[in-house]
Amino acid sequence: MLAMQAQPLPKDPTIRTGKLKNGMTYYIRHNAKEAGLADFYIAQRVGSILEEPRQRGLAHFLEHMAFNGTKNFPGKGKRLGIVPWCETIGVKFGANLNAYTSIDQTVYHIGSAPLKRESIIDSCLLVLHDWSHYLLLEDQEIDKERGVIHEEWRTRRAGMAVQRLQEQAMPKVYKGTKYEDCLPIGSMDIVDNFAYQDLRDYYHKWYRPDLQAIIVVGDIDVDKMEKKIKKTFSSIPMPKGAAERIYYTVDDNEKMIIDIEKDKEQPIALCHIYQKREATPDSEKNTEKYLRDGYIDALISAMLNDRLAELRQLPVPPFQSATSRASQFFLSRTKDAFSLSISCKQDNILGGIVSAVAAAERARQHGFTQTELDRAKKLRLNAAERRANMQSDYRNSHYVNVCVDNFLEGEPLLSVDYKLEIAKKLDREVTLADVNAAVKELITDKNQVVVMYAPDKEGFEIPTEKQLEQIILAAQQQDYAPYEEAELAESLISSMPKAGTIVSEQPWRHGFTELTLSNGMKVYTKKTDYEADAVSLRMQADGGTSQYGDEDIPNFALISSGITEAGIGTFDAVTLRKMLTGKSVRVSPSVGSKGQSISGSASLKDMEVMFQLAYLYFTQPRKDTAAFASLMSRQRAFLANRNASPKVDYNDSIRAILYGHHPRMEPVVQQTLDKVSYDRILEIYKERFSDAANFKTVIIGNFDEQELRRLLCQYLAPLPATNKHEQTNYSRIPQIVGGEKLVKFSKPQATPLANVSIFLTADVPFTPQSDLELDFLRRCLSIAYTDSVREEKGGTYGVSVAFDLDKDDHPNTTLKISYNADPNRYEELNPIVYQQLKNIAENGPAASSMQKVKEYLIKQYAQVAITNDYWSYIIWHELDDDVDFDRDYCQMVEQMTPAAVQRMARQLLDAKRCIEVTMLSE
């Protein structure tokens, strides 16, 4: 048995792999799902852990420089740079062209490249070739990028206390190791001042073939691609006397390591308890034993998380939330750990930690039950079966990730079918005794590290390190009674409703069929094979909270959660979750300002369960005062320190200013909860779902049409109908105020930051043409901002541009421009942001930008038009707005003119409805 488990696993035969003489690895896979497209990646076993002290932050800096001049894509008027060249073929910077740097790896990619010409394939490979060894790293470009990196640091740290706290914790968690100070963003003092040669030294030392892999997946000829890879990359030299790539280890510790870090912008206390253990070496991962060990670890985590979720549902829950997992320790891949993560309540920090530790200790002492194991195994097997059923739908990115994980992490390179075979074998062979023996090894009281991130706030009592150590060790030494649970029912519905009928049926647009049920509900169905094992459901009706006066505002925010937290029918939320374990189904009700809806999705075999849940959410919402008390307790704990982050005050201010302090846009605070009525919530919910005839229902997927008709008659046609056909009361829907306004204020911020949001509104024709003009405008603006504010000025990590077009809003169009920057540069940068919009309004967008956007949108259409989500988007616009956003889309894109985009920009400016809300640092 042990010998068999140690045998190498069979490699996925659909993925071709090889190694060039210079040591470079390659992976190639044909995938026809995305016709005419391919992904090109270069993965590197190189990250910030390899930096020398004077190079802190340069691994990440180098990643940025890979887009700022290479041998064959120098830019600056010589030849196109990588970014502008990629955008000429519809590969958008950020969305399709990007990279990331972590502690141990760096990965670059060109995604969804259109293979319209052989030269595009050659050029994409040439980009990877240059990334490997031929970056220019020119002085001037390095200096320009310093500001961009600094603003990325500012953006990531501001409003993200956890990142700052993590940085503070690392020297204690990793004392005496390379991991003490190794986060990729690095030191801003070094980023701002390093010598050019330091960056070049890092590049030439670590970017080399033996640490690199080329990955190409898509609609390609594998044989031809292999020849191209060999031709393009074989000449890249492997340096002589190359430095050893060391994977730094983490020592064990006898005494518990405890670190408590505080931050004024941290809203809640988070406690992470790690129990360290040895990680499986990459060389030992390609074995059945590795899969078996991982399978058992996943079972244990799933079962323990179910128990922790039960504690969260108590009328007075001990914590906000708690989860367990078996994974890598903190940030180091050379050490694994079992971990507990507890989100604590301010008034019960120690009690919450003890409750989570006790749940883990109970599992260690007594193990799990056969019923729990059966559910957890069912969950794993169902997931494996679903992956096998869906493998024809996998996008290129799925196979790329498999290859990246194999090269960088040593994960087995297995076919989906073999994974299913192994899952079935493990399901049969792994016993309760196996799992309960493993849990005694996984969960321990040795080799522990405890990290707490807490608010730095007067009156917020934080335990001492000594207290944490004492209560955790004490909880681990106690004896606990075995876990018990009630027996589950066999089915969700004890008494089936009397079936209704389909009274009419007719073809509808875009391949949909319109069915009218006996209760008056209209159902629109479209059978697709875009996803082999998926069906989606959305039921929607007008009305929502607009049907109720302002006295009910406190209840609105808790309607959806108040219903789902109670479970459904005769089952509480915990029991319902257990009953649905192993089923691929999700159904959730929602009551919004304009309407109410039920959304769902399922695998084909669980489609009936999806309809049963929808039926129950209509007819049998459950009252559970204990569950609601639990929800309210957690909400109060969450809101206790809500305003710790300045971002919260900023977003509150935006809503208040935009909507003229409308009461329906006020945030939920502690005082709001004081006015909430559970009985009123239930009453509103029942009223919203009392008239099935007012609902339109859309079902899309690879369903059996006769089976779908049976389910419609059995579960949707019997739904009650009052035939009131309520409409949305738009007099109660908040609208953005008119006029021009600049609101600028300052608040203390841990990381000095200018937060800028600009909103321009106007009324434009609600047409596909207007929608497309707005899309072109925002994309052309984004290109202009990248060139001017980011690249030329080094003033921000990025400027975000978004728009909204809603038929029933007045004004119906909003263009939002937002960015973060150094507060000291606000006066310099903000005029540039406005000027770029004025430039388009006065002169039109650049012809090159228009062409880039056209290439991207046409390519994107081919990708999204083979998804169920796209057709859901199309039909709901037709049903709600009587507008076809699909008709002649590509033709409209091709025919879009700079003059049309210019006209839209001018219309937004001429409306003179511009509101800017800016928060600076005190």
Language-model segments: residues:
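Bacterial N-terminal signal peptides
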Residues: 1-2
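Proteolytic maturation boundary segments
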Residues: 6-28, 221-309, 313-314, 374-378, ...
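M16 family metallopeptidases and their MPP-like homologs
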Residues: 29, 34-51, 58-59, 77-130, ...
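Histidine-centered catalytic micro-motifs
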Residues: 56-64
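Active-site-flanking alpha-helical
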Residues: 63-67, 564
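Peptidyl-prolyl cis-trans isomerase
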Residues: 134-142, 430-434, 438, 622-623, ...
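Hydrophobic, small-residue-rich alpha-helical packing segments that form membrane-like cores
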Residues: 141, 146-209, 215-217, 222-230, ...
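Internal metal/ion-chelating core segments
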Residues: 190-229, 667, 673-715
